[in-house]
Curated annotation (Swiss-Prot):
This is Bifunctional shikimate kinase/3-dehydroquinate synthase. InterPro entries: Dehydroquinate_synthase, DHQ_synth_AroB, DHQS/DOIS_N, DHQS_C, P-loop_NTPase, Shikimate/glucono_kinase, Shikimate_kinase/TSH1. The keyword Cytoplasm applies. Residues 1-166 are annotated as: Shikimate kinase. Keywords: Amino-acid biosynthesis, Aromatic amino acid biosynthesis, ATP-binding, Cytoplasm, Kinase, Lyase, Multifunctional enzyme, NAD, Nucleotide-binding, Transferase. Pathway: Metabolic intermediate biosynthesis; chorismate biosynthesis; chorismate from D-erythrose 4-phosphate and phosphoenolpyruvate: step 2/7; Metabolic intermediate biosynthesis; chorismate biosynthesis; chorismate from D-erythrose 4-phosphate and phosphoenolpyruvate: step 5/7. CDD domains: DHQS, SK. Monomer. ATP binds at G11, M12, M13, G14, A15, G16, K17, T18. Its cofactor is NAD(+); a divalent metal cation. One of its GO terms (cellular component) is cytoplasm. One of its GO terms (molecular function) is 3-dehydroquinate synthase activity.
């Protein structure tokens, strides 16, 4: 059986990778290995001497080979040299390691502290010359790569090595997805039982007041969040909003704005959104608009919110004309998807979240579909009273992680939905129409499930996919208890709403469809008869 590192630590020179890595290994009672030390042992000389005699390209080749071997044959904590992740072959090796469940930790230290440590004692060939200037230049080159390569991001500013090690252990023991991109302030989605315990760490020391926005049904979880916040020294304003879509209105938002004003909330204070997707949508909208933007953290408590609304930076409210027509793109400081909260969900609320999970499998990650197939009966029979600590909890955590990764991939390069991100709307053109015509009595995940069947039927009629893939949509979704048909409205009403869809261009319809599993395309202005015939087929 292949032995793989429990965690791989990367970061800039002076970030404390070796010191923190040794502390992590000590706390977990695991062996520790430093790539630079292993290289010196292998080549029989110090790295500065090797650089001088053979040059950097030769060193990087030796380094890449050693790292590839260690990733396959070392069961402990493994720290890499600062430049190691810049080598393409090492990037591929780390990606493969992550695919097999590995954790690559980007140790992100305060630049001033890291530069000071890196300059101690010399012996760093990459810092020859003006050391601080070289460090800053290397940081500018390497930081984006580190963020891309790692799947765990740990900020260590102000922490002792022991404190940083504890933070690494906490993050590694949970699943985490790092969301970043050109237009995004990077943040982490932490997934696992107890993830909410990171709330104070994510908020940081700056806010004095926290607006805790939540719905009444999640009172048990809001009590826990409030206790954590007060233990952290924050002044907490408890704001209860109507449950589900009725809470996403301008009236509710205005009431919160008035309260924030009356209670003296400033730009340095923060918002925590806790609950289902509607609650996190509204909380994000309030955070984005109060004083042109304050820090906020999402604590989703439903499966749907964990895989959809809480991640990606979309915030918004509904209007009489449609869902989410008023809003903004505004990224959270972090998302804490605590699977402990799922244990309080009724079966039907849990199952609707599987609609968005399946969508991510269809558009990008087929492994999601395989997991859903293998565990469809267990997922359909979900019982919160037996969920925690069960094998199903691990399955669900993996599904959440994979689904969030799909969303992060699309969001990272297209925050404002001008291209790639639109592919996340697979099934949503019809789904949103169903929600509107049903006055939001149909839950979002259920509407999206029917919307995906509609999109599959349309793609088949146009000639993009075969009948087998349409049938697969129906069978997989039905096996989990999701609906695959709808008879609640006329085609004319549906068509009018689809023309109002955000993807529409002028008076032309635009759909997201598959041409194969894992690959989506835009379908612009399809034949009217195909649009109507696909609708007839979901009525059966």
């Amino acid at each position: 059986m292949t032995a793989r590192p429990r965690a791989v630590i990367i970061g800039m020179m002076g970030a404390g990778k070796t010191r923190v890595g040794k502390e992590v290994a000590h706390m977990l009672r695991l062996p520790f290995a430093d790539a630079d030390v292993e290289i010196e042992r292998e080549v029989g000389m110090k790295i500065p001497s090797y650089f001088e005699e053979y040059g950097e390209p030769a060193f990087r080749e030796v380094e890449a080979d050693l790292i590839a071997d260690m990733l396959e044959d070392f069961d402990g904590i493994f720290s890499l040299g600062g430049g190691a992740p810049m080598t393409p072959s090492t990037q591929h090796a780390l990606a493969s390691y992550i695919d097999h469940g590995g954790r690559v930790v980007y140790l992100d230290a305060d630049p001033a502290e890291a530069m000071e440590r890196a300059n101690r004692g010399g012996g760093r060939p990459m810092l020859n010359g003006n050391a601080n200037s070289r460090w800053k230049k290397l940081f500018k080159q390497r930081d984006p790569v580190f963020r891309e390569v790692a799947n765990v991001h740990v900020h260590t500013r102000g922490l002792t090595p022991q404190g940083a090690a504890k933070k690494v252990i906490d993050m590694v023991s949970e699943r985490a997805v790092h969301v970043t991109g050109a237009a995004i302030e990077p943040y982490d989605v932490v997934i696992g039982e107890g993830a909410m315990n990171h709330l104070v760490d994510v908020l940081g020391p700056k806010p004095a007041k926290i607006a805790l926005i939540h719905t009444q049904p999640v009172q048990r979880h809001s009590d826990r969040a409030r206790a954590l916040l007060r233990q952290g020294g924050y002044e907490v304003s408890d704001i209860v909003i109507p449950d589900a879509e009725p809470g996403k209105t301008i009236t509710v938002a205005n009431g919160i704005w008035e309260r924030l004003g009356n209670e003296g909330f400033t730009r340095s204070d923060a918002v925590v959104g806790l609950g289902g997707g509607a609650a996190t949508d509204l909380a994000g909208f309030v955070a984005a608009t109060w004083m042109r933007g304050v820090r906020y953290v999402n604590c989703p408590t439903s499966l749907l919110a964990m895989v959809d609304a809480s991640t990606g930076g979309k915030t918004g409210i509904n209007t009489p004309q449609g869902k989410n027509l008023v809003g903004s793109f505004y990224t959270p400081a972090g998302v804490l998807a605590d699977t402990k909260t799922l244990a309080t969900l009724p079966n039907d609320i849990f199952i609707e979240g599987l609609g968005e999970v399946a969508k991510s499998g269809f558009i990008r990650d087929p492994e999601i579909l395989h997991i859903l197939e293998d565990h469809a009966a267990e997922l359909r029979a979900f019982d919160g009273s037996t969920f925690l600590g069960s094998p199903l909890e691990d399955v669900v955590a993996e599904l959440i992680e994979r689904t969030v990764k799909v969303k992060a991939y699309h969001v990272s390069s297209d925050l404002k939905e001008k291209g790639l991100r639109e592919f996340l709307n697979y099934g949503h053109t019809m789904g949103h129409a169903i929600e509107k015509l049903e006055h939001f009595r149909w839950r979002h995940g259920n509407a999206v499930a029917v919307g995906m069947v509609y999109a599959a039927e349309l793609a088949h009629l146009i000639g993009y996919i075969d009948q087998d893939l349409v049938d697969y949509h129906r069978s997989l979704l039905a096996s989990m208890g999701l609906p695959t048909s709808w008879n609640g409205g006329s085609f004319d009403d549906v068509l009018a709403l689809m023309h109002r869809d955000k993807k529409a261009r002028g008076n032309e319809l635009r759909f997201v469809v598959l041409d194969e599993i894992g690959h989506v395309v835009h379908l612009d202005n399809p034949p009217a008869e195909a649009v109507e015939e696909a609708f007839r087929r979901i009525q059966q």
